[in-house]
Curated annotation (Swiss-Prot):
This is Endothelin-1 receptor. The gene is EDNRA. It comes from Sus scrofa. One of its GO terms (molecular function) is endothelin receptor activity. Receptor for endothelin-1. Mediates its action by association with G proteins that activate a phosphatidylinositol-calcium second messenger system. The rank order of binding affinities for ET-A is: ET1 > ET2 >> ET3. It comes from the Eukaryota. The chain crosses the membrane at residues 81-102, 113-132, 160-181, 206-229, 257-278, 307-328, 348-372. Interacts with HDAC7 and KAT5. GO terms for biological process: developmental pigmentation; endothelin receptor signaling pathway; enteric nervous system development; regulation of blood pressure; vasoconstriction.
Amino acid sequence: METFCFRVSFWVALLGCVISDNPESHSTNLSTHVDDFTTFRGTEFSLVVTTHRPTNLALPSNGSMHNYCPQQTKITSAFKYINTVISCTIFIVGMVGNATLLRIIYQNKCMRNGPNALIASLALGDLIYVVIDLPINVFKLLAGRWPFENHDFGVFLCKLFPFLQKSSVGITVLNLCALSVDRYRAVASWSRVQGIGIPLVTAIEIVSIWILSFILAIPEAIGFVMVPFEYKGEEHKTCMLNATSKFMEFYQDVKDWWLFGFYFCMPLVCTAIFYTLMTCEMLNRRNGSLRIALSEHLKQRREVAKTVFCLVVIFALCWFPLHLSRILKKTVYDEMDKNRCELLSFLLLMDYIGINLATMNSCINPIALYFVSKKFKNCFQSCLCCCCYQSKSLMTSVPMNGTSIQWKNHEQNNHNTERSSHKDSIN
């Protein structure tokens, strides 16, 4: 895990060096209403960086142009290629990792329980983002324009792209909250032994999570349109949030705070509350004979709780830099300040690093689980090698989070062993 974190830090630092090697070349003129010129998985660039030509554009809602920064904005070829390599790596790792995660859970009936279903839902949301949104992001960076900008399909993509971004991050956030609640329920109801299968309550939770995520993303599909504008005598079109009603104007004004509060703070607060309650519950169980009876049972569930906590921490680390840059832009930036260009250069650097970290979150969960659970690591390797179920004498069912542990030895079919394995199943 330490090696993995070091490699991620190295690439992020390298990306930062490429961006910051010439700060003047990356300064841009930013207005409050250009927030959504470029979109990245639920949180928008406020910086005009989609064009490969030197750009010095500010496009307010009233169509007038602000005073430009002295320096022009441009994206170096080195950054383009490094960012493209990072995006392609995330695409491959995210698609293989999340698809493998879904395959393991689908093919192994013993893993079809509540928490595994929630993490499968999490993986499916990440997979949708990786397959649909990442290719569009790479195209925008390399081509310097919106795909099919002069066709109806381009308008459809302009609606679909931010909608899926918000839906994906909503699915991630709500699933993490549901996992935290589930871990508390599992510890609080220590005597409940769950067999194979997904509980009805969990199935309802998953359906509700997806429906709510889609509903919360509807304003994105409504507000984003292809906006034509003229720059240096040339006609351009870009996909951006264009408020045309009082509701959309209100949504645009509070959007950054809404994203920070609901899509970032809420899962952290939810995890803190339920993990505190879970800790108190575990401490209350550590008494006399009850402690002995529950020792192994709670040990398994404690390990699951650590895994879920790890996923929440990774989510926080991936998304915090981007939310921080958005809040700084909202609170510190003044578009009428003549000295704003230095701040814009700093915000641009934070946005680039934050966006790449946030995008990594869509592929990092399977990797994290790979390092957290040795049993999942073995099953992951076996699944990729297409030999997960070829053992002759032993059928091992191992979950992706190292929780649903069931060993059935065909030569030693012991009733007590099977009963114990069901008790160790994640609830």
